[in-house]
Curated annotation (Swiss-Prot):
Stated name of the protein: Protein YELLOW LEAF 1, choloroplastic
Segments for region (Disordered): 71-118
Gene: YL1
UniProt KW keywords: Chloroplast, Plastid, Transit peptide
Compartments in which it is found: Plastid, Chloroplast
GO BP terms: chloroplast organization; chloroplast proton-transporting ATP synthase complex assembly; thylakoid membrane organization
Length: 165
């Protein structure tokens, strides 16, 4: 008896024609098996039940294979870009980023004010000049203090004979 269905792999399934199914109840000579003994009818019933199970398992695997091969198309919403508001709505003014105008003041990364560029910090004052005056004052005070501490060791102008006459 030829097999009803063969499977080489789970994905491939070969089903046989209906003529093969009709030949199940006959032996090789084409004669009916009705006149044979009870044991042969049992084997025929066993073969039929086995073949029915094979066909049902083949159908189940075919359904699984068909389900596995189905695909689903995904639809992506297309981006339409920025849309304008309705004509009657209140429009907000679009602000551009605040750029450094090169004015006076602190550099733009710190303390705000948009300063940077130019000759030093401060609002309308010359900061560099004030710093220079402070440094000169500190230098003068340092020399004056040295003269007070070391004045007796070195002597004064009167001791060296450099006094005005």
């Amino acid at each position: 008896m030829p097999p009803l269905a063969t499977m080489s792999s789970p994905g491939s399934l070969l089903l046989l024609t209906p003529a093969v199914y009709q030949g199940i109840g006959r032996n090789r000579g084409g004669q009916s098996q009705e006149g044979q003994s009870i044991s042969s009818s049992r084997s025929l019933k066993t073969k039929l039940s086995v073949s029915a199970r094979a066909v049902s398992s083949c159908e189940a695997s075919m359904r699984i294979t068909c389900c596995a091969n189905q695909t689903q198309t995904a639809r992506r919403k297309s981006f339409s870009g920025p849309t304008s508001p309705p004509s009657g709505s209140v429009k907000e003014k679009v602000r551009s980023p605040k750029l450094d105008d090169g004015g006076t003041g602190f550099p733009p990364f710190r303390f705000g004010g948009g300063g940077g560029g130019g000759g030093g910090g401060g609002s309308n004052s010359a900061g560099g000049f004030i710093l220079f005056v402070i440094v000169l004052l500190l230098d003068y005070l340092r020399e004056f203090e040295r003269n007070l501490q070391n004045g007796t060791r070195r002597g004064s102008d009167y001791d060296n004979g450099l006094a005005p006459q």
